[in-house]
């Protein structure tokens, strides 16, 4: 079921975070000790920041390993139900996304599952470094403030357009395209959502 895949993915993310946190913490601690012994206090701040980052990674990794009791699941309890719906009521699937009657998720990361009604904006985002395209994603802006990204780098224009069209056909509350109108709509809907939750 989708719930088991979601929990498995959370567990693997937790392990990656935990290992990365331990490695970063160990490296920064060893370098911190070396710099203290040598008396170079000017770079001390950088290694303290690295140590803090390592501790944050460890904390998040341990939290993800709690599975259903993780803060991520407690903050978004509907995610387990939506993940199950993806397996039971699947209506569309391709190399990039899975869509059910109620939910949408990138195929590679079920932890980013979202309700179809919560998708407010759909647009492409291209990032360049020195004029070279380094990232090409389709962003789904959600009502709760999250953003689901689908990597479409090095895919044909037709594939990208078809993907956006398919998603927009299932997400009836969503505006398509990056514009001031779309951004203000997303901002307004998120504000209403926060007011209802409080």
Regions found by a protein language model. Give the residues of each.
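Loop-to-transmembrane boundary segments
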Residues: 10-19, 107
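Acidic, Ser/Thr- and proline-rich intrinsically disordered linker/docking segments
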Residues: 123-198
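Phosphoinositide-binding peripheral membrane targeting modules
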Residues: 95-129, 133-135
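Short, Lys/Arg-enriched, disordered terminal segments
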Residues: 1-14, 191-198
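Short amphipathic alpha-helical segments that mediate assembly, nucleic-acid/protein binding
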Residues: 3, 15, 42-45, 160, ...
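Anionic N-terminal interaction surfaces
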Residues: 2-4, 10, 41-101
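Canonical alpha-helical transmembrane segments of integral membrane proteins
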Residues: 15-35, 45-55
